Amino acid sequence: MNAVAKIEQHNPIGTDGFEFVEFTAPDAKGIEQLRQLFNMMGFTETAKHRSKEVFLFQQNDINIVLNGSPTGHVHEFALKHGPSACAMAFRVKNASQAAAYAESQGAKLVGSHANFGELNIPSLEGIGGSLLYLVDRYGDRSIYDVDFEFIEGRSANDNSVGLTYIDHLTHNVKRGQMDVWSGFYERIANFREIRYFDIEGKLTGLFSRAMTAPCGKIRIPINESADDTSQIEEFIREYHGEGIQHIALTTDDIYATVRKLRDNGVKFMSTPDTYYEKVDTRVAGHGEPLEQLRELNLLIDGAPGDDGILLQIFTDTVIGPIFFEIIQRKGNQGFGEGNFKALFESIEEDQIRRGVI
């Protein structure tokens, strides 16, 4: 069951969670590498678009679209950014009404690239020139039933490692743009700020503002650098612009999921050993097996008996500078604020080793 932030407010476009995230790469080799990555992460390639080089990967309630189109907006995006996250989609109650409202609030509608007989899904210009699709359920048929041919004998969980749904999706923006993008989501869909962090490492720092939709199912933290050399600025330089930094996917058993992912060849960011020396003090009474946390490099945060805890881990960068987060919530609806500094410092130490700062 989806854990959601408890938000009670006007929902002008009827948001109801993430529908999909779309990825691309500039050439066939890059597309094949993404296909292999999604297989390693437990997704099954269940369908192919009827007329385009577009493929659907699924696992429980997570939909990933892999777009290998050699022309058009997506290809231009890939040529600029390399392997990248070129779009995301919100589930909404009525897509056309949602698009009209968003446009009335200053969003820029992007022209459709649908062919005859295909769904014309409204899209807005999003972060870094990516697209933000607005998708409703079109009665009894999903968007995939209309535009995709499903592969016989395959189902979403054939290769599942236990990932269940998209928990949040984080943006990295240029300095001075955090207010711009938080304001964008506030205007078009009545998002509200639920967390704000100011993280300082040894040499660099960042600000982060977490925005949540009225439905409580769409959470978008927005990161902005405090200086020229932080990991946020490095991302923007490598990615050639702003964009989606990471995608957080939930699991009901992070220990089992991470073991399966490791067995499949997925690499994770390391955690300093000193982190685990402080866990029992920082999260007293957490009740988790400390040696397994250490073995798997899992991070823990929260307040047992109060708001609960969460467990999380981050992959290495796997799509250009983009990475994935695996998260299990045990009552806690935060973003691992207590881990931000530890994680920030570990990435910063890697930057120092590589001579970036």
Curated annotation (Swiss-Prot):
Keyword Acyltransferase (UniProt): no
NCBIfam families named in the record: 4HPPD
Residue ranges of every copy of the VOC domain listed in the record: 17-137, 165-316
SUPFAM superfamilies linked to this entry: Glyoxalase/Bleomycin resistance protein/Dihydroxybiphenyl dioxygenase
CDD domains according to UniProt: HPPD_C_like, HPPD_N_like
UniProt-listed Enzyme Commission number(s): 1.13.11.27
Xref: Gene3D superfamilies: 2,3-Dihydroxybiphenyl 1,2-Dioxygenase, domain 1 (3.10.180.10)
Pfam families linked: Glyoxalase, Glyoxalase_5
Family: Belongs to the 4HPPD family.
Single GO MF descriptor: metal ion binding
Record text on subunit structure and interactions: Homotetramer.
Keywords (A to Z) from UniProt: Dioxygenase, Iron, Metal-binding, Oxidoreductase, Phenylalanine catabolism, Repeat, Tyrosine catabolism
UniProt record, GO biological process: L-phenylalanine catabolic process; tyrosine catabolic process
UniProt catalytic activity: 3-(4-hydroxyphenyl)pyruvate + O2 = homogentisate + CO2
Biological source species: Pseudomonas aeruginosa (strain ATCC 15692 / DSM 22644 / CIP 104116 / JCM 14847 / LMG 12228 / 1C / PRS 101 / PAO1)
Cofactor binding notes: Binds 1 Fe cation per subunit.
Residues given in the record as Fe cation binding sites: H168, H246, E325
Name of this chain's protein: 4-hydroxyphenylpyruvate dioxygenase
Domain of life from the UniProt record: Bacteria
Cofactor: Fe cation
Keyword Iron belongs to the record: yes
Pathway: Amino-acid degradation; L-phenylalanine degradation; acetoacetate and fumarate from L-phenylalanine: step 3/6
